């Protein structure tokens, strides 16, 4: 049994953020809500989402593993309007997920589910020496600057600063967020440094990780030298976690 009712706009944000990296995912449903984790096809990035039952207006669920074609679901959810109620309903006999948009007009779609062999993928428990909380808008702007120079980007923590750096054959880009400077408009909300660190990442993946964020969303970024970067943020009570493997420099 699985049936849930929620706001179309909020669910759309979660699905869009998840589908930027993966095409298929397993919804692990139980009485507490929905969890899901998946690796991208190249096994460079991991995405995890958690939607507790409290984010839904109505929720009923027992233990189910539901294999979802995220691309198909994303296209259907895109047809929903923000003022419509979204109803998700599992049809176990037909092996389909029914998606209903309800206002003064009712529209219903059905998505065929895929077989799930294993759904034990979890976000690894890694201890990081450093973390920052930063406004998504400021982080995304720094990525846009770096994109003018190279397709890889270095994230550095050093001397009370969070540095986003990119270097090409001739040009370079650097954005420095200085935690020692107090400013009402400071993009850094939190800065925790245990040791100096630097890691380099594929810029396209970082853009995908943050593509669905709003400017005022707060990103929690965990960093260490040559360690995967972990990025967390919330969407209307739902939690999204992304891990991206570093590019090992010779």
Curated annotation (Swiss-Prot):
A Pfam family assignment: PCNA_C
PROSITE patterns in UniProt: PCNA_1 (PS01251)
UniProt xrefs under InterPro entries: DNA_clamp_sf (IPR046938), Pr_cel_nuc_antig (IPR000730), Pr_cel_nuc_antig_C (IPR022649), Pr_cel_nuc_antig_CS (IPR022659), Pr_cel_nuc_antig_N (IPR022648)
GO molecular function: DNA binding; DNA polymerase processivity factor activity
Keywords: DNA replication, DNA-binding
Assembly information from the UniProt record: Homotrimer. The subunits circularize to form a toroid; DNA passes through its center. Replication factor C (RFC) is required to load the toroid on the DNA.
UniProt similarity note: Belongs to the PCNA family.
Functional summary from the UniProt entry: Sliding clamp subunit that acts as a moving platform for DNA processing. Responsible for tethering the catalytic subunit of DNA polymerase and other proteins to DNA during high-speed replication.
Name by which UniProt lists this protein: DNA polymerase sliding clamp
Source organism (scientific name): Methanococcus maripaludis (strain C7 / ATCC BAA-1331)
Name of the gene: pcn
